[in-house]
Each structure stands twice: as structure tokens, then as C-alpha cells.
Amino acid sequence: MQAARELLATHRYADISVAAILAKSGAAKGSFYFYFASKEDLLAALVREAVAGGLGAAELWTGTATTTDPAHAVRDGVAAGAHLWRQQAPVLRAIVEAAGTDSKLDALWRNQMDMFTQAALARLDGDQESATWLAGRDPLPIVAALTWLGERVYYLAATRTPPFDTEQAVIDVLTDAWTLALYGRRPEQIAPARPT
């Protein structure tokens, strides 16, 4: 798996062959196919591993008690997400790009993203400040939109696309989006999270 990670750091997923992965790793073809049916299966394993780390990062907000200021927790979670995307950029870039051409990878990515949506919805359950702001509106489409917004902004940061080419810009815009949509307030009074 490490050889694939290293290749993804310098090559587009579509341009990497199983032969290139084998050459980089020094593994035998039979060894590769013992663990993975295809390079898509290898990417899926790398994505699951990265997303597991992402769910841990999201817990800075989703795992907080409702007594914690949610704007602080959102900013901390967004900062941890930005750090994760920076660390896992090659793998996460690859899945975003490959999902558009492979139905199994697309289904996997949608499922992985839905886990973030569901974690955020669970966090909002019983959150009085958000419930007051949302005033009876169904939070699912709002949270799903925010999840996919985050995916796109993190992806643009991973590809170093301005204006999202600095971690602070990513943290600021996503914190604003989440806190304004879910709490109706800007986090200006919050000390900025420092990029990790």
C-alpha cells in the first residue's frame, strides 16, 4: 500500500498501473492479487484507511458535548480535517478524481462522505442552539450540502487551487459556512485555529 501512496504523490491515479505499483514495491504479482482484485480495490482500501482518520478528526466537533461552544468545536474539527487532507492528499485526490469514472469507487466515496453527514447529524441531535436557528427545518440536506462543500474545498486545497491554497483560508471559509448555516452566527469572536 505504501508503494501506491508514493506513486499517487507524483502521478495521477489514472496513469498508475498495477505493474508500476509492483515495480515500486518489489512485490510479486501474485502477492498483489492475493490482497486486491484490482488497483481500484487497492485505492478503496487506502480511502477507507484515510476516512477512518477523517472521522477521528471530525470528532473534535461531532464528539463534543452540547455544552461546548459549537463554533469553537467546528473550527477545531475543520482544522483537523484540513490537516488530514494535507497528509492524505494523494489518496483523497485520487478517489475524488476516480469516482467520476468508476461506479464502485463512486459508491464507496458517497458512502464514506455519508458517514461524515451522519456523524454531524448525530452531533446536532439535542443541540438547542442549532435547533433554534434551524427553526424546524430538516438538517439533513443542510448538513449533506456542508459535507460536500467541505469535500470540494479540501480537494481544491489538496490540488493547491487558489484561493484555497492556504490552510488558514480553508479553515476560515469552512468554519464560516458551517457555523453560519447551523448556528446563524459568525465565529469572529473565536480565536483562529492554527494550522497543524
Regions found by a protein language model. Give the residues of each.
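Amphipathic, non-transmembrane alpha-helical scaffold segments
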Residues: 1, 43, 47, 51, ...
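Hydrophobic alpha-helical connector segments
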Residues: 45, 59-87, 139-146, 171
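Short secondary-structure transition hinges
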Residues: 71-72, 76, 86-118, 133-136, ...
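Short hydrophobic clusters on alpha-helical segments that form packing/core surfaces
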Residues: 3-8, 50, 81
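Hydrophobic/aromatic-rich alpha-helical bundle segments in the mid-to-C-terminal region
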Residues: 97, 106, 128-176, 185-196
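Helix-turn-helix
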Residues: 7-41, 45
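Amphipathic alpha-helical linker/stalk segments
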Residues: 10, 46-75, 92-93, 124-126
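Short alpha-helical functional segments enriched in proximate histidine and acidic residues
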Residues: 7, 84, 119, 123, ...
